[in-house]
């Protein structure tokens, strides 16, 4: 006698209602296979009805097996019993699509698959057979959950998110026809949610269909969906539907640890195998720790990928990651930069944010291609011997509802009080005091270093993290427990971030954009510092651009703005930035900031670059500066490459290339960039003539470079400076050379001409001077120079004789 088709069901009505209503927080207690003790009467019918029904069963029944499933779009659902290959139809016990099959003759679990027949979009039918997602055991290990809960899971992306995996058959202890099942393992942190579901085209975005299991130890929800359900794996669109416990909160969320997302304005996450790319940068990685030391040259080309170059013939579209690799790598290599720095490539919904309002902390933006495409981009730079630094934004995140904000119906990632709102950018501020949030951010940083082989991270808006009163008026903030304005939780996070990153990935660079005088930013945490490797020298940038924007007639009144930076140049490990922030929002381009007529504008820009490359500190130049772009930077259009048809713009580009070459090849210009032993004034008092001179020392003192700067358009004849050694001093670079668009004024004689084209009165080739045994400016020797207008001249002794 068969009882599969009987109208009697065993699932309690409240459980059926919870699943159908979308508020079931423990789906594994309801769905899937269950052994039911029918003697308890805890079924879908009363005890009396159950006893009456069981009286008709021709054998004793105390325990039975049920299989339950919820498929609201199914026309029929059946169970295939794998040990007998019997197909048993399931009974629809709720019109919304709750199905149940009761196996009265069985008392122990058995292997099975579900067969679901649904209507298709074209009016036909489609049938899928698969292992029940609710037949699989626990997915994440207890150790993983322990690390997540204590905030120390630094490979978080390997357990959370969506992963293509092959799991052992859920019936490995039975006679299962397969050893493993391929599919996608989903996991997300949402400790305060009532329910979290995986949704996508595979379940018509209905959050009731695939609710997840809650692992209360760490507040993580997990579910494995076989490939047969999903209709594939890689490239699959999905989101998490999060139902909160309070206020009827129901929201579709992108995966916080997703590796790939749709191009805005769409926002679904995309399943991607993050580990399949095969790298070809072993040589670079093996020597990275050596080439990224403080005593090595670091010259950075800052790039916004969406506007470096576009394709006007195709609707002004972006270049892809692979197209950028083909064009940008040889360009950066030719220009002599050692590194590029990318404005944030993490996924972000708003183009106007330039990438600084991130929703995908584990995903390169899909605007330019896939994660593998971006890996290929980084790989190409490494094979060319160029490092890649990524801008990374742990200070704040946007309020877009598909992102992190109010993720589980509570302030999960953000502070829930006044600290949670950023007054400048109208964004949310991470809760740096919560262990799981700190873990999320540290894991994100490590993700880019491990998975994408980034060589460093530049941390944006560090100052906004350090101070509780940042951009807040009195009454809008509260002091810390000591009565100060220091954000103690953020400071502790920054220190921990730098400690972990340097321990896990030796040799990478951590760079701070910190705009205040916070002490010891680039000192180790064990001596009280924040632990960064470098800090942007915003003071140098501000003072230098202010000085160069002045008419040369008035520069003598602002001489201190030029020289002040040397008072603190070695208090931190500095990078000198001429960044994207200085060429937008009405500030004008670098060329546009320069005073004077057309020739003087270009001469001033050449002098600015010469002074920057001569000044102690690593270098950073935003794209467009090297071609003397007239316009401010526009994120929505390409750089004005057509300007290179004019000699003046070619000259600036040629100068930047040669400055990089000189910086890389002359130890004096980089070995002691961050050490006071590498710099010594010759004379900084000549404010009346706006002339300064100094020595850049190398570790081998014989390789020193003397730098002389004339920041007026007046040629200074017979200008004497002291030098440390006798012998012949040769120009190794002069920003006034004609090949750069300058006047060609010779430092050693009369008339004009390019380097090496004429002979001066002394008999030396133009560009060379002989030191005289005439003490000057506390030096035993001196040279007599002709200083070209608006120029910076680099001199090096030709021989090592003393």
Model regions and ranges:
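Substrate-binding/active-site clefts of carbohydrate-active enzymes
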Residues: 258-262, 282-295, 304-486, 785
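Carbohydrate-interacting/catalytic domains
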Residues: 1-39, 49-53, 63-122, 126-171, ...
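Hydrophobic residues within beta-strands of alpha/beta enzymes
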Residues: 77, 196, 340-342, 457, ...
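Conserved alpha/beta catalytic core and glycan-binding cleft of carbohydrate-active enzymes
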Residues: 264-265, 453-455, 470-638, 643, ...
């Amino acid at each position: 006698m068969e009882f599969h088709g009987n109208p009697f069901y065993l699932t309690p009505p409240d459980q059926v209602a919870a699943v159908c209503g979308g508020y079931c927080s423990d789906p594994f207690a309801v769905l899937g296979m269950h052994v039911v003790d029918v003697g308890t009467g805890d079924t879908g019918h009363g005890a009396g009805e159950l006893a009456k029904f069981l009286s008709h069963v021709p054998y004793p029944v105390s325990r039975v097996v049920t299989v339950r499933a919820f498929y609201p779009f199914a026309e029929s659902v059946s169970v295939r019993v794998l040990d007998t290959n019997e197909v048993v139809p399931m009974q629809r016990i709720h019109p919304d699509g709750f199905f149940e099959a009761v196996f009265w003759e069985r008392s122990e679990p058995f292997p099975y698959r579900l067969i679901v027949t649904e209507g298709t979009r074209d009016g036909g039918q489609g049938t899928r057979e698969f292992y029940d997602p609710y037949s699989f055991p626990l997915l994440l290990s207890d150790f993983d959950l322990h690390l997540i809960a204590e905030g120390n899971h630094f490979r978080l992306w390997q357990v959370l998110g969506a992963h293509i995996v092959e799991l052992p058959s859920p019936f490995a202890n039975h006679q299962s026809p397969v050893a493993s099942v391929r599919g996608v393992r989903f996991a997300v942190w949402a400790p305060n949610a009532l329910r979290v579901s995986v949704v996508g085209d595979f379940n018509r975005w209905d959050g009731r269909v695939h609710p997840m299991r809650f692992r209360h130890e760490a507040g993580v929800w997990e579910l494995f969906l076989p490939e047969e359900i999903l209709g594939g794996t890689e490239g699959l669109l999905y989101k998490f539907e999060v139902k909160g416990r309070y206020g009827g909160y129901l929201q579709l969320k992108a995966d916080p640890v997703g590796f790939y997302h749709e191009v805005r304005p769409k926002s679904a996450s995309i399943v991607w195998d993050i580990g399949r790319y095969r790298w070809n940068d072993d040589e670079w990685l093996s020597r990275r720790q050596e080439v990224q030391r403080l005593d090595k040259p670091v010259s950075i080309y800052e790039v916004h990928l969406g506007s470096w170059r576009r394709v006007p013939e195709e609707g002004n579209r972006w270049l892809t990651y692979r197209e950028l690799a083909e064009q940008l790598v040889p360009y950066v290599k030719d220009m002599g930069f050692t590194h590029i720095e990318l404005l944030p490539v993490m996924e972000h919904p708003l183009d106007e944010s330039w990438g600084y309002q991130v929703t995908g902390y584990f995903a390169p933006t899909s605007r330019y291609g896939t994660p593998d495409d971006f890996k290929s981009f980084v790989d190409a730079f490494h094979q060319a011997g160029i490092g890649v630094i990524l801008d990374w934004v742990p200070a704040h995140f946007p309020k877009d509802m598909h992102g992190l904000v109010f993720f589980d119906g509570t302030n999960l990632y953000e502070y829930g009080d006044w600290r949670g709102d950023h007054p400048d950018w109208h964004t949310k501020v991470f809760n740096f005091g919560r262990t799981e949030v700190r873990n999320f951010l540290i894991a994100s940083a490590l993700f880019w270093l491990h998975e994408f082989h980034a060589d460093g991270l530049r941390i944006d808006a560090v100052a906004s993290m350090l101070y509780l009163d940042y951009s807040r008026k009195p009454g809008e903030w509260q002091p810390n427990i000591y009565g100060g304005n220091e954000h103690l939780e953020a400071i502790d996070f920054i220190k921990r971030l730098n400690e972990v990153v340097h321990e896990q990935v030796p040799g990478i660079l951590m760079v701070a954009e910190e705009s205040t005088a916070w002490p010891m930013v680039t000192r180790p945490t064990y001596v009280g510092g924040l632990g960064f490797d470098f800090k942007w020298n915003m003071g140098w940038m501000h003072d230098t651009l202010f000085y160069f924007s002045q008419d040369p007639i008035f520069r003598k009144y602002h001489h201190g703005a030029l020289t002040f930076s040397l008072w603190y140049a070695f208090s931190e490990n500095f990078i000198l930035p001429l960044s994207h922030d200085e060429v937008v929002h009405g500030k004008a381009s670098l060329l546009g900031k320069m005073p004077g007529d057309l020739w003087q504008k270009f001469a001033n820009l050449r002098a600015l670059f010469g002074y920057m490359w001569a000044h102690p500190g690593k270098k950073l130049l935003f794209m467009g500066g090297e071609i003397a772009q007239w316009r401010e930077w526009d994120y929505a259009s390409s750089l004005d490459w057509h300007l290179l048809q004019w000699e003046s713009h070619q000259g600036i580009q040629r100068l930047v290339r040669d400055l990089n070459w000189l910086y890389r090849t002359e130890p004096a210009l980089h070995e002691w960039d961050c050490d006071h032993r590498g710099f010594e004034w010759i004379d900084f008092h000549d404010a009346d003539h706006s002339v300064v001179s100094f020595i850049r020392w190398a570790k081998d003192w014989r390789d020193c470079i003397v730098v002389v700067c004339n920041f007026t358009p007046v040629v200074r004849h017979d200008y004497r400076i002291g030098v440390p050694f006798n012998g012949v001093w040769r120009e190794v670079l002069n920003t006034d050379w004609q090949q750069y668009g300058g006047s060609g004024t010779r430092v050693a004689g009369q008339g004009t001409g390019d380097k090496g084209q004429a002979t001066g009165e002394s008999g030396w080739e133009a560009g060379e001077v002989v030191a005289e045994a005439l003490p000057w400016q506390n030096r035993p020797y001196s040279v007599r120079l002709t200083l070209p207008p608006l120029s910076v001249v680099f001199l090096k002794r030709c021989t090592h004789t003393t």
